[in-house]
Each structure stands twice: as structure tokens, then as C-alpha cells.
Amino acid sequence: GKALLYFEVVTTVALLIGLAVSTFIEPGIGVIRDDIAGGDISKYTQKAAGFSWISFLKENFTVQVLGFSIFFGIFLNYVKGKAKMIAGMQQASQWVFKGLKIVMYLAPLGALGGMAFTIGKFGIHSLIPLAKLMLTVYVTMAIFVFVVLGFIMRSCGERIWAFLGYIKHELLVVLGTSSSEAALPSLMHKLEKMGCSKSVVGLVVPAGYSFNLDGTSIYLSMATLFLAQVYGIDLSVEQLLTIIGVLMVTSKGAAGVTGSGFVVLASTLTALQVIPLEGLALLLGVDRFMSEARAITNFIGNGVATIWLAKHEGEFHQPEA
């Protein structure tokens, strides 16, 4: 219970930081909307003006599926022989993400084509807003790591810089693969060697890859506001709160594999029905570069979460000699 509470609080802080920075810097301002998509967005602005929670829950298939999944998971707790069902679902999930991984290997070719088309049609100046978004995302995640996660580490009597040095080889693996899942076994071994109990590591790290994706949370909130700014959609306070609420749920559906954040972003926009999905084409060209920042932040965040819980549960022992 304490682990889930930690996950929810920290990822919510990540979402709020992403929204705050995007609102202040406005990376989407300056992007020419007609250069992205020529479709009619009036239906989206009409939905924004006539928003209601009843229609939101009734019309959004994504939210319905997520809600069903949550209640189905609760129901499974009371079913005998649930282990086989859970194992089957985990196996199916692995197949899906293996397929996604294969697709993402080809994504750079599509991204290259998209970038070449953008530059050829609109000029090199069209990349400036994308560079602004990338820089904003990287700076925001750095602030989150060294300020928020740094504060959490200090509260545990540890230092964030020392921890980053301790896992530097794993960080290079994550950077090279753009997947925080690639270094999962090594992270668990290092945390146990550092002094965290095996039971805490075995619980927090795997759970964190579904519930504690700090980097993905920052990216989702910033990308959502970026696209809203691109299309000139002035979001109300109620809609911003709705975005936070939806992201608090959909961000838990991402995985530590390359490209999953982009898939979750598409699901989020589908659920919101306020921002045109065509805008995702603009992000495709730079998503691979931002995926590295997401993966590294997710990776560090799960390590810090494990240390925090081990310290607070009295499950942190002297490091091995």
C-alpha cells in the first residue's frame, strides 16, 4: 500500500511539473498549424466547449476499457486458480510489446521520412519549435531528477549524484536502447547489493514499471499541452483537471519498452477528444529522441522508489562488502 501511494504521489507531481513548465514556456507557440494538418478541427473545439463528465465517460472507449481492466483486476483477487489466468495475460502482454518493439525498430525510417518531408516542404525553420519542445522536455526531466528525486534521496540519507554514479553502466544501456526495461535485471541486482532487501526489490521494481513511470508522466503532460498550443486550443481549468485525471490513469498503462509512451499518448488524446490526433504526426519525428529522456527518468525513478521504501520499511541493510 505504501508503495502504491508513493507511486501515485510522485507521478502526479511529475504530471503537474510537466503541465506547469509547458504552460510557462509554451513550446507549441510558433508552430504553424496548417503546416501540420489541413483537417477541420472545429469538431474538437466544439467538444471542448460542450464538455461534460457524463458524455466523456459514455463516449470514450479507451476510458471504458481502462475502467473494465481495473474492476477485472479487483475481481481476480477473489477467484480461485487466478495464477494461470494472470500468467496467460502476462504472456499475451509480452507478445504485444514484442510486436511493438519490432515495429519501433522500423520507426526511425518513418521518422526520417517525416523529417525529410517537413524540411523539404516547410524549410529548416519548421524544426525550431520541435527543438524547443525537445529541449524543454530534457530540461524538465533533469529538474525532476535532481530536485524532486534528489529531495527524496536526501530524506533517506542518500545522495542522488552518488546513486547515478553507482548505476552509470545501466544508464548507458537505457540510453542506447531507449528502454528502461533493458537494464531491469541489472538494476535489481545493484539495488540488492546496495542494501535493499530482496523482497522490497522484487515488489517495487516490477510494479514500478507499470505504476511509477515518472519520465512518461512528464512527457505525456508536456506533449498534450504542446499539441493544444499548436492547434490554438485554449484549455479551461476544468479541462486541465480532466487531462490530469486521465493521465493519472493512462500513464499507468505504459511499459518500459521503446515507443510505449507514444502509444499511451495516442490513447490519451483519443480519450480526451479535445486535441486532434493528427498532431501526433508532428511528434513522431522527435519521439525517438525524447524516448531516451523518458526511459532514463523512469529508470532512475524506480531505483529511488525502491531505496525510499526499503529505508522506510526497515528493509535496508548494510551493503555487501
Where are these regions (language model features)?
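Signature of multi-pass transmembrane helix bundles
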Residues: 2-161
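Transmembrane alpha-helices that form the ion-translocation and gating core
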Residues: 9-38, 136-169, 173-174, 180-183, ...
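Membrane-interface alpha-helices at helix entry/exit sites of multi-pass transporters
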Residues: 1-6, 101-105, 193-209, 237-238, ...
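Transmembrane alpha-helix boundary and packing residues in multipass membrane permease domains
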Residues: 19, 70, 74, 110-117, ...
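Alpha-helical membrane segments and immediately flanking helix-loop junctions
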Residues: 166-220, 248-265, 289-308
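Alpha-helical transmembrane segments of multi-pass membrane proteins, especially transporters
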Residues: 2-11, 65, 86-89, 133-137, ...
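Transmembrane alpha-helical segments and their short flanking loops
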Residues: 221-321
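Juxtamembrane helix-boundary/capping and inter-helix hinge elements in multi-pass membrane proteins
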Residues: 79-83, 122, 157-161, 191-201, ...
